[in-house]
Amino acid sequence: VGIVGAGPAGLLLSHLLHLAGIESVVLEARSRAHVQSRVRAGVLEQPTVDLLREVGLGARLDREGLPHHGLSLRFDRTDHRIALSELTGRCITVYGQQEVVKDLIAARLAAGGRIEFEVSDVALHDVGGDAPRISYTDADGHPAELRCDAIAGCDGSHGVSRATVPAGVRTEYQHAYPFAWLGILAKTPPSHEELIYTHHERGFALHSMRSPELTRLYLQVDPGEDIADWPDERIWSELHERLAVDGGFTLHEGPLLDRGITPMRSFVVEPMRYGRLFLAGDAAHIVPPTGAKGMNLAVADVRVLARALTALLTENR
């Protein structure tokens, strides 16, 4: 199986196929250092954690992940805690996407898996037949080709895979929301042990975290805002204003390691299969980061896709 994209979807699919005895090659346009440092979602739902443990990828997750048994909804300067574990028997775990990627890369390389980083000129051929091909230029500048039994397009919303499905076959649905998120990663301990989702007249705010030393915070802003207009002082002032609560709340400040503005949009393409090309993760659907669903949906996709490819390639069904 040729897999385009070394994000969580592509790497986990490669690992699942390996466990089923099916070889794969993962092609990635970026460097290993880049994909291992991309700050993305950090909330793993219980089925995602269960699967990672099931396939031997839970050791560091269990050591370093932060289980959350509830979350707070903050309205009118008052907290309303939702006791997730008490109500459902399950929890969420805070563990950065880049950490999941590190674990997956380490597992694939330890098993002798083939991941090619810094490839370019990727193109998919003959995906409508039984012998699809991927042509590309490798990291050393040499042209190369993979002959595959199937191709998994796990290269996100801007990759080549989705665009390879003919326009007359695919249907796209999208919606742009009239707001964006300004997100920061701050080198400071979290100000609260759980996530806080805040409703405020000036806009939404979210207190989250990536580790006991790193806090992730978000502000709802206009999609036309320029990050250059948001110096540290303005960001912290707005966070203090929106996260204020009766009874006292101390927002810990620290150096900003990352900042950016993300437009809120939803996108879905169908079908997710065309011939021997299968789309997964952001290549097939994008949801706003408001619910931290992106990586969890990608994991759910490849869990199903791995089973389907195993049936196709080992049982011809």
Describe each model-derived feature in a short phrase.
Residues 23, 58, 114:
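Residue-level detector of anion-binding/catalytic polar loops
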